[in-house]
């Protein structure tokens, strides 16, 4: 069996030098690096990642936990964009990804921490995990470097990244109000997620700021699916036909809301105005084009990777939560009641 000692003998260097080259560690000259790599390729030597991990106490892998309430898996457009940019940055630093399934038979008996340690990952990336998950305290206490998206996970080796969900939601409601809307409903989520709760807060703050009356039946809770938006909008319009606008905490909700409005024989953007949240790529196929709050998904993925690398590679790094600004994208689903009055 070919070993690094065989490489070292042929290259005329020590085994430790070969190890440094193969693991990308400093302290080796450029010519020696090129020579070792050339001989490695000639002999067809492939380092054993498990053995290397035992020697360095690093597996160069990152575990990804994703809890999917809607069973859409990695097909969800918001998730796709974040994961793509996260993978690019983490991969460029020599790390591979391990995806932990959320329907594994051991899920009910093994914690996130236990599964992460079993796979010997260097860090964790969490998405879609609700604040109420009983495993989160153990993850924070474990000191396994961890970064999360839209989950306020804080600890010595844990940090999180989120969009300005409160500000983004408030900007959507402010835009409705600037167009003369006063009877504005909100569809948020019932999963106790940070984005859902924060977007509801933004809606409430904007309504209160402008002294608008608010009926409890104007707030509907749903999941983040188009079906959830459809059912919620049906209830909203049945309970109060005088509503003129609906803010949806997610674009998929908004697409369902648009369908419900059309079912009522009403026109989206004329009879009832809609604003979503996310700016998913699917919107380019929707008519009328949806006004929405855009999240910088690629930037979130890149920042998550960079923060996790710091947490994994610098034991003294102490991170602060990162909030990324949003942008209201104005399209065709909000009518101007001021002009029509």
Predicted regions and their residues:
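N-terminal helix-turn-helix DNA-binding module of bacterial transcription factors
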Residues: 1-60, 340
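Bacterial carbohydrate/catabolite-sensing allosteric modules
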Residues: 10, 42, 85-94, 141-148, ...
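Alpha-helical recognition/docking segments in bacterial nutrient-uptake
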Residues: 2, 57, 61-174, 178, ...
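Short gly/ser/thr-rich secondary-structure transition/capping motifs
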Residues: 42-48, 105-109, 129, 258
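Residues at alpha-helix caps and immediate loop-helix transition turns in enzyme cores, especially N-
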Residues: 32, 75-78, 135-138, 196-199, ...
């Amino acid at each position: 069996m070919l070993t690094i000692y065989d490489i070292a003998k042929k290259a005329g260097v020590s085994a430790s030098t070969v190890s440094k080259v193969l693991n990308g560690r400093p302290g080796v000259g450029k010519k020696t690096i090129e020579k070792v790599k050339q001989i490695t390729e000639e002999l067809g030597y492939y380092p054993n990642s498990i053995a290397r991990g035992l020697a360095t106490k690093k597996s160069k892998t990152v575990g990804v936990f994703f809890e999917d309430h809607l069973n859409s898996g990695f097909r969800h457009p918001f998730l796709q964009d974040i994961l793509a940019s996260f993978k690019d940055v983490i991969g460029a630093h020599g790390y591979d990804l391990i995806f932990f399934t959320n329907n594994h038979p051991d899920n009910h008996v093994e914690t996130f921490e236990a599964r992460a340690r079993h796979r010997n990952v260097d860090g964790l990336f969490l998405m879609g995990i609700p604040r109420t998950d009983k495993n989160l305290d153990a993850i924070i206490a474990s000191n396994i470097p961890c970064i999360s998206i839209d989950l306020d996970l804080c600890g010595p080796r844990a940090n999180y990244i989120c969009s300005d969900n409160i500000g983004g939601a408030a900007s959507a409601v402010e835009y409705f109000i600037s167009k003369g809307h006063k009877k504005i409903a909100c569809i948020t989520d019932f999963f106790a997620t940070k984005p859902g709760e924060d977007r509801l807060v933004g809606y409430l703050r904007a309504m209160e700021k402008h002294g608008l009356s608010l009926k409890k039946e104007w707030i509907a809770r749903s999941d983040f699916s188009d079906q959830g938006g459809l059912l919620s909008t049906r209830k909203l319009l049945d309970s109060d036909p005088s509503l003129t606008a609906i803010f949806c905490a997610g674009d998929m909700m908004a697409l369902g809301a648009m369908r419900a409005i059309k079912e009522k024989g009403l026109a989206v953007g004329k009879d009832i105005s809609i604003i979503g949240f996310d700016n998913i790529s699917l919107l380019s196929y929707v008519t009328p084009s949806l006004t929405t709050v855009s999240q910088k998904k690629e930037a979130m993925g890149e920042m998550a990777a960079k923060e996790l690398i710091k947490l994994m590679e610098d034991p003294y790094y102490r991170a602060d939560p990162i909030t990324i600004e949003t942008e209201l994208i104005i399209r065709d689903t909000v009518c101007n009641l001021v002009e029509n009055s």
